[in-house]
């Protein structure tokens, strides 16, 4: 298993096995200082993961996407696991799969460092860092 890419972006589309991304980012700047009573809310984003599998990876697997804070605690209810099966035809040496998840109304109870943890079969294989910060005067993103 080779993770070619794991990214947080504004939008993602898969058509004819081609992965298209729009607006990859790693920082969210909020206009109000978030708190547990008034969390910062990001209206919509997407996670895109592209993975190449070889013959040793054949069989059933499960992908999990978890959003965690700097202390390692989840910030949202767990997304349902994505079960999938890897099968390679005899004439292929590898197969590539695209996985996407759309996240709406993502809430951040405080400014700070977060990450999107990508797990296959319960093992963390990639981590996408995400910084949530309060805007300074004149700053937007």
Model-predicted regions and their roles:
Residues 2-109, 115-120, 124-141:
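Contiguous segments within soluble domain cores/interaction surfaces
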